[in-house]
């Protein structure tokens, strides 16, 4: 305040410390992405959003957008903003009364701005009329209606922008929109019809239409009921009747990027969470695939310098540190180093290098959109301090279009590594002993596991890769070539929302498959232990000594027999462990044959012949082993396994528990 008059701009118009805002932008990207996401989730859950014009976050926008589903979040306006809003509104009225020529106040709009009028109120009314050009389908949530969650996001962002006091609108109108939000009254906006260049003109005009009581305006109430303007005002508790727009107020309501940036905020909240989830899923993938944790070594990533990669590797390293699966895998590698390749395939080994840049892109886009939702982006801007209206182009939504295109490309890349990992997981040629399609049932002919899921994943990923194509290179000149370049911000945000939905489908399918793999590793471990014990018992009974207690040369076979069990994949024989065409019985027999061939002269003696004991050994095993294997399956189904699930001692356990216990996601 100067001499009792509100001043809404600094004397020189620039911040001396950081005039180009690069310092603030760079500072916003310091610190950890993980910490940012945790903060975002915390903000999303807060019950109140306090608006002052400059501190709104994407997570708060996402929280308000989701609040319409029953989790109410209240919006409060800063009383300190009232004076600035009033000052700009008063300036417009005084300017009009003095006969000052101002765009959108005394002139037409866009390509017809050469026209003049002194009837400012009627001009605003006509603005809303001609912008109400959207097309709706049947119903209030049809394929041609903007999702109500996105409308709520747009309302919040527009209030925040107008609170800064550069737009020439009454504070009472902002209070009315706030009441709509707090009482879950949502105007119906068209899904299409904006190019986000002179702002999101067409969809925002329907909010203005509701405020002014246009007959075609509709809203949806808390229970999904359709409301006309009168009912919407009544349920929201907005008193004083419909608003008669003063000069500039219609333009202030529609000439902003709130619909595009609101939806972008919703998208980026989910994109950040999904990016973090992809890092965690990659670590769990390493666990169930018996991967080598060396790929997360900090020196490797420090030498690459990229912060997203370094953090992705650190998160994976943290999850794998001390993992029981990693310890078990290390024993497998030591026991038979030739059983699998020296290095894991790229989908695992280079996952930090792949995911890191995508996270950097998403993080940068988040900061860009947060700047946008705290920006004043209409035209003209009312600078009370210099007693002038500034004609510019802050309504151009290029930050939205560019950030959404980039985010969509990053989302597609995350989807690509997700399906690559999933494809390895369900393929028994690559997955280090897990059954084909993660089936694991008693009868492989009647259990196809995730075969349908793999087909669905291919469909999801194909659509996702198509959506990765940019929107912003499809600009068409509009409005008699006045809007000859335009951002297509909302269109890009809508496509990115589709991409996020598809990545959620992929991540959900993949997560359930990982949980299935964890359970199969548990079954595998118990089954292998039982098979080893059974083979050991039969070997001691049949191969160790004769009827008179004499020791047989065949007693030395047991160690090699158990080594076969250790090395053989359980699910290669689990459905019928004694079937002679399966590798287990073939290799056990080969051990006995090899020992017999090395038995020398004693092999000629029927009492010490190993060949003579092969049939007895196999018959004894066939009598016992299938029953023992079946008992393991029964214990698995009843949750009474003798060896506990390794996942419970791992840092990835909370995610497994969430799916299997909280959601009940059994397969």
From Swiss-Prot:
Coiled coil: none
Modified residues (2,3-didehydroalanine (Ser)): 198
Entry keyword annotation includes Cytoplasm: yes
Biological process annotations from GO: cinnamic acid biosynthetic process; L-phenylalanine catabolic process
Pfam short name (any one): Lyase_aromatic
Matches recorded under SUPFAM superfamilies: L-aspartase-like
GO cellular component: cytoplasm
Known catalytic reactions: L-phenylalanine = (E)-cinnamate + NH4(+)
Matching Gene3D superfamilies: Fumarase/aspartase (Central domain), Fumarase/aspartase (N-terminal domain), Phenylalanine ammonia-lyase 1, domain 3
Enzyme class: lyase
Annotated compartments: Cytoplasm
Active-site residues from the entry: 103 (proton donor/acceptor)
Alphabetical keyword list: Cytoplasm, Lyase, Phenylalanine catabolism, Phenylpropanoid metabolism
Gene Ontology molecular-function annotations: phenylalanine ammonia-lyase activity
UniProt modification remark: Contains an active site 4-methylidene-imidazol-5-one (MIO), which is formed autocatalytically by cyclization and dehydration of residues Ala-Ser-Gly.
Main location: cytoplasm
Segment forming the signal sequence: none
EC identifiers of the protein: 4.3.1.24
Assembly and oligomerization: Homotetramer.
Physiological role: This is a key enzyme of plant metabolism catalyzing the first reaction in the biosynthesis from L-phenylalanine of a wide variety of natural products based on the phenylpropane skeleton.
Family of the protein in this entry: Belongs to the PAL/histidase family.
This protein's name: Phenylalanine ammonia-lyase
């Amino acid at each position: 305040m100067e001499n009792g008059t509100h001043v809404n701009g600094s004397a020189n118009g620039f911040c001396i410390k950081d005039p180009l805002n690069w310092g603030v932008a760079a500072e916003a990207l310091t610190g950890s992405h993980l910490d940012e996401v945790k903060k975002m989730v915390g903000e999303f859950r807060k019950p109140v959003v306090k608006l002052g014009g400059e501190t709104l976050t994407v997570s708060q926008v996402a929280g308000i957008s989701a609040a319409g589903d029953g989790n109410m979040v209240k919006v409060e306006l800063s009383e300190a903003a009232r004076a600035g809003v009033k000052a700009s509104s008063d300036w417009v009225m005084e300017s009009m009364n003095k006969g000052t020529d101002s765009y959108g106040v005394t002139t037409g709009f866009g390509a017809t701005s050469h026209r003049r009028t002194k009837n400012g109120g009627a001009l605003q009314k006509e603005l809303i009329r001609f912008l109400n050009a959207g097309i709706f389908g049947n119903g209030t949530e049809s394929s041609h209606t903007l999702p109500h969650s996105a409308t709520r996001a747009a309302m919040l962002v527009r209030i925040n922008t107008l609170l800064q006091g550069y737009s020439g609108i009454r504070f009472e109108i902002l209070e009315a929109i706030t009441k709509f939000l707090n009482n879950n009254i949502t105007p119906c906006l068209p899904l299409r019809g904006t190019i986000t260049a002179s702002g999101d003109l067409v969809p925002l005009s329907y909010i203005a239409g509701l405020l002014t009581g246009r007959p075609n305006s509709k809203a949806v109430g808390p229970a999904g009921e359709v409301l006309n303007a009168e009912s919407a005002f009544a349920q929201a508790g907005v008193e004083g009747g419909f608003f008669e727009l003063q000069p500039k107020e219609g333009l202030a309501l529609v000439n902003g990027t709130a619909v595009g940036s609101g939806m972008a905020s919703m998208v980026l909240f989910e994109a950040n969470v999904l990016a973090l989830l992809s890092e965690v899923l990659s670590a769990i993938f390493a666990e169930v695939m018996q991967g080598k944790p060396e790929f997360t070594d900090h020196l490797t990533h420090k030498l690459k310098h990229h912060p997203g990669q370094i953090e992705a590797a650190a998160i994976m390293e943290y999850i794998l540190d001390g993992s029981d699966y990693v310890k078990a895998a290390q024993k497998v590698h030591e026991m038979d180093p030739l059983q699998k390749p020296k290095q894991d395939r790229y989908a695992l080994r280079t996952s930090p290098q792949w995911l890191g840049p995508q996270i950097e892109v998403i993080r940068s886009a988040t900061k860009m959109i947060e700047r946008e939702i705290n920006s004043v982006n209409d035209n003209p801007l009312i600078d009370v301090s210099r007693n002038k209206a500034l004609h510019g182009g802050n309504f151009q939504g290029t930050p939205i279009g560019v950030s959404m295109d980039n985010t969509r490309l990053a989302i597609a890349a995350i989807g690509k590594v997700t399906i690559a990992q999933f494809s390895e997981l369900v393929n028994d040629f690559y997955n280090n002993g897990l059954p084909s399609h993660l089936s694991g049932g008693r009868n492989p002919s009647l259990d196809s596991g995730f075969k349908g899921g793999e087909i669905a994943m291919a469909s999801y990923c194909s659509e996702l890769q198509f959506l990765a194509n940019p929107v912003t290179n499809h600009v068409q000149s509009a409005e008699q070539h006045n809007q000859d370049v335009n951002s297509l911000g909302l269109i890009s945000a809508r496509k990115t929302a589709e991409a996020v939905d598809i990545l959620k489908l992929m991540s959900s399918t993949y997560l359930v498959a990982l949980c299935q793999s964890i359970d199969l590793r548990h079954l595998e471990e118990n089954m292998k232990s039982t098979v080893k014990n059974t083979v050991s018992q039969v070997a001691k009974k049949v191969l160790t000594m004769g009827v008179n207690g004499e020791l047989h040369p065949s007693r030395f076979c047991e160690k090699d027999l158990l080594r076969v069990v250790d090395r053989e994949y359980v699910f290669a024989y689990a459905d019928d462990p004694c079937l002679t065409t399966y590798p287990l019985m073939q290799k056990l027999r080969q051990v006995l044959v090899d020992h017999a061939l090395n038995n020398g002269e004693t092999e000629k003696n029927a009492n010490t012949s190993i060949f003579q004991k092969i049939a007895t050994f196999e018959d004894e095993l066939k009598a016992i082993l299938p029953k023992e294997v079946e008992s393991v399956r029964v214990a698995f189904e009843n949750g009474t396994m003798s060896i506990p699930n390794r996942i419970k001692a791992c840092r990835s356990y909370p995610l497994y528990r969430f799916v299997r216990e909280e959601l009940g996601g059994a397969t």
